[in-house]
Amino acid sequence: MNRLSEQIEAIVRDRLANAKECLAAAKDTFQLKYYKTSAGRLYYAVFHLMRALLNCDGIEMKHHSGVISEFRKRYIKTQIIDSSVSDLISQLYDIRSKSDYSVFYEISAEDIEPFFEETEALFQEIEALLKTMYDNFSVEKGQ
């Protein structure tokens, strides 16, 4: 089995914590009917999950397009992560971009509600993958 350095493991754990926080914020803002904000938080949850896996391979990218492209190349095209995740990424990126930059863009609860389950499933899949790939990996520090 492979081992992550303590530094990389700490970075990955931080990315997972950020993803978890974004997912919680997405749920909270959804309940408040702030659907654009909720969609943005869902996207960023997925973004942090992608960065966590890339960090395991020693890759640090900040630009969204680079992260998405490299994630697809390394994990989706190689079938490590299911190809349906590519659609999830595209849809959330598109909604987040329109929510942030388009005038008069509207989004409803029905538009984003399905993405919660998919994002939570991806979170669980990536955590399980990390535990399988790296024998010293733990989600929580010190475990």
Segments (PLM) and residue ranges:
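Terminal alpha-helical segments
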Residues: 1-143
